[in-house]
Amino acid sequence: MNEIAMNAPWPPHAGATTALASLQPTTGIRIEGVRKVYAARKSSAEVVALDGINLHVPKGSIQGVIGRSGAGKSTLIRLVNGLDKPSEGKVFVNDVEITSLSEPELRQARRSIGMVFQHFNLLSSRTAFGNVALPLEIAGTPKTEIEKRVLPLLDMVGLADKRDRYPAELSGGQKQRVGIARALATEPSVLLSDEATSALDPETTDQILDLLKQINRDLHLTILFITHEMAVVKALADRVAVIEGGRIVEEGSTFDVFATPRHEVTRRFVSSVTGSGAPDWLLAQPHEPPGGKAVLRITFKGSDANQPLLSHIARTLDIDINILSGQVEMIADHPFGTLIVSLTPSPDILRQVIAKLSTNNNLVEQLGYVA
């Protein structure tokens, strides 16, 4: 990146978007009607990567975007940090329309946007200190100021004692911590994360997610991250958008999306971490076998996840209810439980059980039968 361009007068001309002078943005990221189409090549038709994306990320919140490979997640991140432009629509960061900026304006605007990469993108010839200092050097920051900025960042990510280590001497988790510190060097108000934990082991992933939550709390950063892992969404996000085929098919608070997934893609993601999916052996018996039992899946939300509703119903109706599988966990600080149970398939009994369980917005589904 050209240092002269980085230090060009700001704004470069009197008519340049005065929105950039907004000191108190009301929103972190706003995406309006975005469509991204890649032109056709000789051997293939045009590719619609994003189609009608609308997303609002409140300032200071953590927004997850989850989708399978090829769903459009990475394209979305590229549009937010200005590495690419949409075919249609607008992208705003801190109330500034990124999509309308000139190159000098965009370079300046990117200083308020930090980026954390999947594969760290560290320079092997630079120490941890040198990698974190790099964006400040490019921006022409004085050396004395660089040291004042970098050392607290290394301390924040737990690497104060690794300042002189090279990437080859660091673990994967430590490399990502350097990457996070580097992303914070220019004191951004928005942090973008592109699959930041997918190359890490489970324990290190948890540590990095805890670090991102701490940074969000302490620095009041707006965080937008993309992932293909619902466990990451569950651990980190305030809100989540599910993207499929370039469209957002579901969006809401993390708890609501987990508790009541509406789209089939969302249900598959949720069942991968909550155990709420029906096992294959059960789906193979959609009809009642002789002497069989009906199988119900019950999703408990909020305080009901900790209540003895099943035992109360079993006593009241004088029936046996067998628990086949289940778990209770915390999602976005709310209890959430899923149980798969079997019971006598009498229509009258089933009707009463479902009616009693369906109170307080619990979700009850009949999945099939077991012998």
UniProtKB/Swiss-Prot annotation:
Keyword terms: Amino-acid transport, ATP-binding, Cell inner membrane, Cell membrane, Membrane, Nucleotide-binding, Translocase, Transport
EC number(s) on file: 7.4.2.11
Domain of life where this protein originates: Bacteria
Domain ABC transporter: 29-270
A Pfam family per the record: ABC_tran
Membrane disposition: Peripheral membrane protein
Family: Belongs to the ABC transporter superfamily. Methionine importer (TC 3.A.1.24) family.
Protein name: Methionine import ATP-binding protein MetN
